[in-house]
Amino acid sequence: MNPVVHFEMPTQDKQRMVAFYAKTFGWKAQMLGPEMGDYVLVTTMETDQNSRPKTPGAINGGFYPKSADKPAQYPSVVVAVDDIRDSMRKITEAGGKVLGEPMEIPGYGLYISFFDTEGNHVSMMEPTAQMKSGGHG
């Protein structure tokens, strides 16, 4: 099985969204800046020295800026896969639609989004060898 390892939510105002989730749930945020697409890493629970959740089954996530040229902007999950190309093939064969080509996220792995058969926006990531072994970026 391939586990859900991350969640993502779009934002119009990252400062406002970070403040909301910090105040409401105590989540912590790390702003990555323009060189990483103004992505915000979100920690939802205590993590170990490798930035992995200490609570089994728990996941962290991120916020990304909404953009007029990207129509699929709503909360989604990220599934870890061993072989992103093989998973892309399986998605297409099962009736889903892969959105573009995988992009490399430095230190993390290959990432791509897709629509399932019900139109849900989901993403998947093939982690780097370092991430698979418990290392972090």
Describe each PLM feature range.
Residues 3, 57, 108:
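Exposed loop/turn and edge beta-strand positions of beta-sandwich/beta-sheet ligand-binding modules
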Residues 8-57:
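Core segments of cupin and vicinal oxygen chelate
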Residues 35-39, 71-73, 105-110:
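Short acidic/glycine-enriched loop/turn segments that link adjacent beta-strands
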Residues 61-63, 122-123:
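Conserved beta-strand in the GNAT
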Residues 1-24, 74-77, 126-137:
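N-terminal beta-strand motif that seeds the catalytic metal site of vicinal oxygen chelate
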